[in-house]
């Protein structure tokens, strides 16, 4: 790919880089500057701007372009404003400089996840408005905080508020992932995050003795049971070339805690696990399996949830569904190859789907390595600009979906 010099940079790219320079990095994001940036975008685009504080210091910004038929449900274009932490020593360039190299690659935290999509929404609406378009359905763009740490002070609270109900959303778009091939990945569901702490209690004593019924022995049994399950799921994924990672349940041991000294057998030890539960799993049965593994290890072994999501929904991806037909039809007109998948991690889409609103996760980045959360996260400006073109067509198609049963 080639790129133009800085004197002829596309205005959409300049805006993208400006947004990337706002340091909304966890654990102390500069949300205030992001909101100010979005307020200015609303003013320039002639859109209404609503700010909803769902928790102290956590503001959701909603930009709205009214449709011509208020009886129809709206289109929700969702993105999050926060980004994950960085290890600057591993970056070729300052991750908050939005440096663009001679080939056109823009290096910045958030370049893929997901400030690119936020600006693509805004630029798609700007283009459609400047061309004089009006659509039957209202378009809301929501910019939410806290997604990278679970969304508990963001979308999870927002969907329960009257301001969200007032948006009357009928369909939503949210983030996806890059695809290194020619195809574009679209996500219609996602795995449920279960963060679990297993605690084992046993007999303490001097470490020179063979003590029976120790916390470590019993915790070891649970760890073995869970890792055996992990291996079974890993082999199931590897054995079936048609399965994607999001279709199986993953688990990783992420933390071990316990002990006070080298020569003291601890009375308590714990292990933390990050499960990502596939949407077709029987949640109640799986929780009973966890209980069984703890019981089999012996007395005094329990588990608790640090995070538990149990309402996975799947957005239809067949042509009888009007939303999918509009989305996939627009992609077909652009000769885009779609690969529908289950998102392997978690996004704010899970909260949107849980309240009955179909949602697709889509970040238009093909021929691009997946670099979210990675060192040297980057996106080529040509890929970004094509994404603006793609979202312009998608927004127009979705906002033009005719009235559905019950809407008029």
Curated annotation (Swiss-Prot):
Q: Which GO terms describe its molecular function?
A: aminoacylase activity; identical protein binding; metal ion binding
Cite a GO CC annotation: cytoplasm
Superkingdom is: Eukaryota
CDD domains on file: M20_AcylaseI_like
Its EC number is 3.5.1.14
Entry cofactors:
Zn(2+)
User: Its principal location?
Assistant: cytoplasm
One Pfam family assigned to this protein is Peptidase_M20
**Active site, UniProt feature:** 82, 147
Residues reported to bind Zn(2+) 1: 80, 113, 175
Q: Which residues carry this modification: Phosphoserine?
A: 408
Q: What class of enzyme is it?
A: hydrolase
This chain's function reads: Involved in the hydrolysis of N-acylated or N-acetylated amino acids (except L-aspartate).
Protein family per UniProt: Belongs to the peptidase M20A family.
Q: Which protein, by its recorded name, is this?
A: Aminoacylase-1A
What organism, scientifically named, is this protein from?
Rattus norvegicus (Rat)
Give the source lineage, highest ranks first: Eukaryota, Metazoa, Chordata, Craniata, Vertebrata
Q: Which gene encodes it?
A: Acy1a
């Amino acid at each position: 790919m080639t790129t133009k010099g800085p004197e002829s940079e596309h205005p959409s790219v300049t805006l993208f880089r400006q947004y990337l320079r706002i340091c909304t990095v966890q654990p102390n994001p500069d949300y205030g500057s992001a909101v100010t940036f979005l307020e200015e975008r609303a003013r320039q685009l002639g859109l209404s701007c609503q700010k909803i504080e769902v928790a102290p210091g956590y503001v959701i910004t909603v930009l709205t372009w009214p449709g011509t038929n208020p009886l129809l449900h709206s289109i929700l274009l969702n993105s999050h404003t926060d980004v994950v932490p960085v290890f600057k020593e591993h970056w070729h360039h300052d991750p908050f400089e939005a440096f663009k190299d001679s080939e056109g690659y823009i290096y910045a935290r958030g370049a893929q996840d997901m400030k690119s999509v936020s600006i693509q929404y805004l630029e798609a609406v700007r283009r459609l408005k400047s061309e004089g378009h009006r659509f039957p359905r209202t378009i809301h763009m929501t910019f939410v905080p806290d997604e990278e740490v679970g969304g508990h002070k963001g979308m999870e609270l927002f969907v329960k508020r009257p301001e969200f109900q007032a948006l009357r959303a009928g369909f939503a778009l949210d983030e996806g992932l890059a695809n290194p091939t020619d195809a574009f990945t679209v996500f219609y569901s996602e795995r449920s995050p279960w963060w679990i702490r297993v605690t084992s209690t046993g007999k303490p004593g001097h470490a020179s003795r063979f003590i029976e019924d120790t916390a470590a022995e019993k915790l070891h049994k649970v760890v073995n049971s869970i890792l055996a399950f992990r291996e079974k799921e890993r082999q199931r994924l590897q054995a079936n070339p048609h399965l994607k990672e999001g279709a199986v349940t993953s688990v990783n041991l992420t933390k071990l805690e316990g002990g006070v000294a080298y020569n003291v057998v601890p009375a308590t030890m714990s292990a933390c696990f990050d499960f990502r539960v596939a949407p077709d799993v029987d949640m109640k049965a799986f929780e009973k399996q966890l209980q069984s593994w703890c019981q089999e290890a012996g007395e005094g072994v329990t588990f608790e949830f640090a995070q538990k999501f149990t309402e996975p929904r799947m957005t239809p991806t067949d042509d009888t569904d009007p939303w999918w037909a509009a989305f996939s039809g627009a992609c077909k007109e652009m000769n885009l190859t779609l690969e529908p998948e289950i998102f392997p991690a978690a996004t704010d889409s899970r909260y949107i789907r849980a309240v009955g609103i179909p949602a697709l996760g889509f970040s238009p980045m093909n021929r691009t390595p997946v670099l979210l959360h990675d060192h040297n996260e980057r996106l080529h400006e040509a890929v970004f600009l094509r994404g603006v073109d793609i979202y312009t067509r998608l927004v127009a198609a979705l906002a033009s979906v005719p009235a559905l049963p019950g809407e008029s």
